[in-house]
Amino acid sequence: MQQTVIVAMSGGVDSSVVAYLFKKFTNYKVIGLFMKNWEEDSEGGLCSSTKDYEDVERVCLQLDIPYYTVSFAKEYRERVFARFLKEYSLGYTPNPDILCNREIKFDLLQKKVQELGGDYLATGHYCRLNTELQETQLLRGCDPQKDQSYFLSGTPKSALHNVLFPLGEMNKTEVRAIAAQAALPTAEKKDSTGICFIGKRPFKEFLEKFLPNKTGNVIDWDTKEIVGQHQGAHYYTIGQRRGLDLGGSEKPCYVVGKNIEENSIYIVRGEDHPQLYLRELTARELNWFTPPKSGCHCSAKVRYRSPDEACTIDYSSGDEVKVRFSQPVKAVTPGQTIAFYQGDTCLGSGVIDVPMIPSEG
């Protein structure tokens, strides 16, 4: 009996190539599914969903495959955007892409795949799955510049049992070449960057529509002197340099702490200031593909583009771990996701929980 693969299509070149590969080289019945998570200009947000859907339509018509659209705009606002705003209001810096994968793409979209009679869900993520073992393992994509396992690290492994990542073994150059050879309408379309609902506008400009400006003090961590004013502590993230508007300093200034209750931010001068670095952190909201034992030696990424950092994981409680790095790590940001690896295998992830105000040590 012919099986059905449903391709999550975004209107970009990656998912277009996924649909093409399944249609051209497999016996699967292929269906395209476009997911709309944000209403145009909804609540001040911008999104290119209309143009993206038109591109999905063009690709599917060329490939002669059926296609559908589903709107999760309401659920996205409730399960991703609302949390995004709440975390920012509390001083954290969440990653909405990781939230979207967990709450929408590999939950609600999975259910839609089942409704449509799909056997598999295929996406254009640059990562791999090892299904040969008893437990599904998430692996890095073979292209280190495009590896997206970090963004999948917060997704429950139970949600990946029927997922296919055909681009995991490829690099972007190969994908572009396939798209060009197949004359896909999206072959030369630029990759999307940034957060969907923010669009091309400055991040602060978007955020202040929901978290109003509130003037507060900028405090020099070393001297404890007030050196300037800011428009809201929640707009700033640990390690941030841009947007401080502090003149008269020979060295660059960086945010090292925030006091949300007092609406103050703390800065240090110089990119190598010791307060910018941490040797350990706590991670909460753990999600494991391959649960490590306490004392496990592995590596970790504290943000998407950060290098792997050697570390040790120790369980401090059932839902938290203590992470100790071999070398001090710069600009560790509360609210961001830390993903753990052993070689190419992603062990899982947690949410970084470090003090908003650094210690005096």
Swiss-Prot record:
The keyword Transferase applies. It is an enzyme of class 2 (transferase). It catalyses: S-sulfanyl-L-cysteinyl-[protein] + uridine(34) in tRNA + AH2 + ATP = 2-thiouridine(34) in tRNA + L-cysteinyl-[protein] + A + AMP + diphosphate + H(+). It is found in: Cytoplasm. Residues 95-97 are annotated as: Interaction with target base in tRNA. One of its GO terms (molecular function) is tRNA-uridine 2-sulfurtransferase activity. One of its GO terms (cellular component) is cytoplasm. It holds the Pfam family tRNA_Me_trans. GO terms for biological process: tRNA wobble position uridine thiolation. Its EC number is 2.8.1.13. It comes from the Bacteria. The active site is at residues 100, 196. ATP binds at residues 8-15, 35, 124. Disulfide bonds join 100-196. The record marks 125, 336 as: Interaction with tRNA. Keywords: ATP-binding, Cytoplasm, Disulfide bond, Nucleotide-binding, RNA-binding, Transferase, tRNA processing, tRNA-binding. Residues 146-148, 303-304 are annotated as: Interaction with tRNA. Belongs to the MnmA/TRMU family. Catalyzes the 2-thiolation of uridine at the wobble position (U34) of tRNA, leading to the formation of s(2)U34. This is tRNA-specific 2-thiouridylase MnmA. It comes from Chlamydia pneumoniae (Chlamydophila pneumoniae).
